[in-house]
Amino acid sequence: MDNSLHATTIYAVRHNGEAAMAGDGQVTLGQQVIMKQTARKVRRLYEGKVLAGFAGSVADAFTLFEKFETKLQQFSGNLERAAVELAQEWRGDKQLRQLEAMLIVMNKDAILIVSGTGEVIAPDDDLIAIGSGGNYALSAGRALKRHAAQLSASEMAYESLKVAADICVFTNDNIIVETL
């Protein structure tokens, strides 16, 4: 039996001057057991000016949150620089390479995915999703952005994650939304 804790959905969007990130609350042990339904996977960092969300191993994600916040402090809140430096360290360090998590980080100006393989990716359309329900949330978010532009970013984030929760067994509808 797979005893790793994983599976989630994180979605982030910038729309009409607002930035929002949403995450569900489910933590799954292996493929069969829901261990927790109210986990908080989206956090405010750097004096509340940056949002970060994770998908993957919980313990690994906390390590990455700490390292990313250190990089933000080191580079005076420069999101892109902190993300690139974290990705370089993550990829270059033998111990860190073992971490199994992905991050979405954002501020009012940018959204980035940071991965352990060294990628720092900015989406073309100001929305992105990761995790087991990521493709469902991303699809819903794109449809909302195109056809329901009157919604706020926080409403889009919530509704996109709600769609993912309706489809993905590893995503629940205990949704936390943070906005900037």
Curated annotation (Swiss-Prot):
Keywords: Allosteric enzyme, Cytoplasm, Hydrolase, Metal-binding, Protease, Sodium, Threonine protease. Na(+) binds at residues 165, 168, 171. Protease subunit of a proteasome-like degradation complex believed to be a general protein degrading machinery. It catalyses: ATP-dependent cleavage of peptide bonds with broad specificity. Belongs to the peptidase T1B family. HslV subfamily. It is found in: Cytoplasm. A double ring-shaped homohexamer of HslV is capped on each side by a ring-shaped HslU homohexamer. The assembly of the HslU/HslV complex is dependent on binding of ATP. It is an enzyme of class 3 (hydrolase). This is ATP-dependent protease subunit HslV. Coiled coil: none annotated. The keyword Metal-binding applies. Allosterically activated by HslU binding. GO terms for biological process: proteolysis involved in protein catabolic process. GO terms for molecular function: metal ion binding; threonine-type endopeptidase activity. Gene3D superfamilies: Glutamine Phosphoribosylpyrophosphate, subunit 1, domain 1. Its EC number is 3.4.25.2.
